Amino acid sequence: MHLRHLILILLEILLFDYIVSVLLYLKYFLLLLENLNGEPELAEVHYMPDNLEDTQEYFEQIQSPNLRWSFTINHAHFDPIGIKGFVEGMDMCLCEEVRVADNNGEYEIHMKPGTGNVDFGEMFRLIESSGFKGHYMNGFGSLDDMLEGREYLLERAFEQGIGINS
């Protein structure tokens, strides 16, 4: 194992301990853990958690009503298990918000809905049938882009027979 990998492992342990400390001391605040995106092996930064297993481990190790999940679908979209794998693998009752942006399925990018290849109708069907009770939040472009994207997303939900509170 390279020294760099040992340092990254130690940093992950320290970060995990720090999160536990934050939850102990800030018991009146809500902390959302986002599923991040994987990075190439030689990348300078490796985000945590960047896959389903890491995300599950955080929730198994830190049992607190103050730790909830922020599900970023465009990060999940280019993960090998995809959006469906995350929705089926996580307890969606732990999900406080779904962060929405389109993606090309190849790398980290926050695109306006309809410009990438996320199947938003299927995404809404999966999430709305999973026990999710939180809110959706757009995470792409300008305010005008997000308002326009909101209409596109509502249309995709409606096509699936899903009424989203607007």
Please identify what each model-predicted range represents.
Residues M1-L8, F29-E39, M137:
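Active-site groove signature of glycoside hydrolases
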Residues H2-L3, I13-D17, P49-S166:
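Histidine-acidic metal/acid-base catalytic patches
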Residues L8, E41-M48, I73-A76:
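Short, surface-exposed loop/turn motifs that are enriched in glycine and acidic residues
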Residues L10-K27:
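An active-site-proximal structural segment forming one wall of the substrate-binding cleft
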Residues Y28-I62:
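Basic- and aromatic-lined ligand-binding clefts that recognize polyanionic substrates
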